[in-house]
């Protein structure tokens, strides 16, 4: 089991190409890569709670949302991001079983909380990996608090610790690691740790790819 790895992906420049072609759609990139698909977003008014909505693009469906037959992903970007995580796992010698979920998340500034709801993503032994797609404010907090997966089987509400139930002034959950976004950087950590997004600055959009990987 690995506690945390923070490293750049094999070829960080591919993130620039993706963002220019498929997110920003800048003129120079359109001229060079005519026909590159643009990201299609889904608005999620309720993520961990309705306090923290976001835009989302599914790369690989969560295990419980997958159809009994057919494709687990119809995203034109999954092959691209699958290669990135596969290379990262290989380059860092990370043994694993399979990728169970992948998603592009796009969040914006919020001023009603200093971070999102602390949460875990998956009810079994897994790593969470986050690839940062742009250089903007908005850290990831990895908390010094871990879930017991047996408790998740008994009570699924324990996936999330609602932000408003925590006494952040007098009895906060301590932050073990704070990861600041850097384009092309990946952080992979033990998925039993609760984690949360921090708000980006007004006028910015924070874009990441999040993966869950069982071991």
Set out the residue ranges of the language-model regions.
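Catalytic core of non-heme Fe(II) oxygenases with the double-stranded beta-helix
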Residues: 73, 78-82, 86, 91-215
């Amino acid at each position: 089991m690995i506690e945390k790895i923070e490293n750049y992906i094999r070829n960080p420049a591919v993130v620039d190409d993706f963002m220019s072609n498929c997110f920003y759609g800048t003129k120079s990139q359109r001229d060079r890569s005519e026909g590159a698909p643009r990201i299609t977003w889904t608005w999620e008014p309720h993520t961990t709670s309705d306090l923290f909505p976001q835009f989302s693009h599914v790369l690989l469906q969560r295990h419980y949302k997958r159809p009994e037959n057919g494709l687990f992903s119809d995203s034109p970007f999954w092959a691209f991001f699958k290669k990135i995580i596969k290379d990262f796992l290989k380059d860092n010698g990370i043994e694993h079983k399979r990728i169970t979920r992948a998603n592009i998340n796009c969040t914006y500034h919020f001023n009603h909380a200093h971070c999102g709801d602390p949460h875990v993503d998956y009810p079994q032994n897994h790593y969470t990996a986050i690839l940062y797609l742009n250089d903007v404010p908005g850290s990831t907090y990895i908390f010094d608090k871990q879930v017991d997966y047996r408790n998740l089987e008994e009570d699924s509400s324990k996936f999330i610790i609602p932000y408003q139930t925590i006494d952040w002034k007098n009895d906060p959950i301590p932050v073990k690691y704070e990861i600041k976004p850097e384009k092309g950087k990946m952080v992979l950590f033990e998925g039993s740790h609760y984690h949360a997004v921090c708000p980006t600055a007004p006028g910015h959009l924070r874009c990441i790819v999040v993966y869950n990987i069982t071991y």
